[in-house]
Amino acid sequence: MWDLLIPGNRGTLVRPGGSDVASHTIFTGPKTLAETILPPFGVGDLRAEEGKVSGLKLFHTTNSGVTEVMPRLAAVEADVQDLVEAHMETMLGVTFLASEYVIDCVDGGRIDSLGLDENGAPVIVEYKRGTDAGVINQGLYYMAWLTNHKDAFRNLVRDRLGGTAASQILWSAPRLICVAGDFTRYDAHAVREHRRSIDLVRYRYFGSDHFGLETVASVTGHSASAKRVRRRAAGAPPVRMQGGAMAELAEAVDEVLVGLGDGVTRVQRKQYAAYQRLRNFACVCPPQQKKLLVYLKADPKEVDLVSGFTRDVTGLGHHGTGDLELQLRTERDLERAGDLLRLSYAAA
């Protein structure tokens, strides 16, 4: 039995052994960005920093007491890369495409991992064992190459996932995910200065059986298709969409999803709008005449399904991601769905 004591912030804890990787998200009250990011440290301080991961403590519990499982960094960077690549969809919500991808340019280079996220956006993942001041600039260099060589990436997607996936790549919202032992406060500031979608993700091993991921900073690039969603000012009247009751309901759903927490990103596709943290937690389809369909990442088997309100769509084709379908017709339905929306948000 494992007991988690978490004073603040969120992350994902997974068991790194075998193909049946179990994962869950741990979520508590939010911290400020400054509180979650450790000050810069040198190579000589790495050992001291291994136990400092935003106050997270993991305990092994028995009838006779508890034993703390000390966090540690990977022995080598490749250990982290191999683990994440083997379970990238579970850990990051990204379909793995290629490892150590050699780019064809004058200066050369190898992209650690290439992938495609749930909404079809290209993803570059870079790894560092500890703290590395150059990881963001290195990733941005690779992203610039990627956006200038779309055919190469499109061919890779076609070879791995087929022609349909290759034709639906979301080029307006490429992403960079940096997975490292830690980041400095300067890193967190730097990502805000770039007009790109960047996630800084901190990792730790806990003993030999557990592996933790924690998003410490997330910034979305300025584009029409993928933009950081900001909550409306307190007391300001909601801005309603044109198009009748269902359009107004869609706007109300948008306000609720945005209000679930800081750092929510809306990615607009033709068939749906995805709301994500590191991964999607809700997808909202365009309003129908009498109802609005919302798809969540909640497990339908853990929900009391109600005919005409919730439906298990596991294995069924639909736009967006998620196995639980919500059918909303009124704002009262939206109120009923509150717990399910929060459950899906926490799982992302």
Per-region residue spans from a language model:
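Short amphipathic alpha-helix segments
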Residues: 298-306
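Basic nucleic-acid-binding interfaces
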Residues: 326-328
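Charged, terminal alpha-helix-loop-beta segments
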Residues: 2-259, 265-268, 272-283, 289, ...
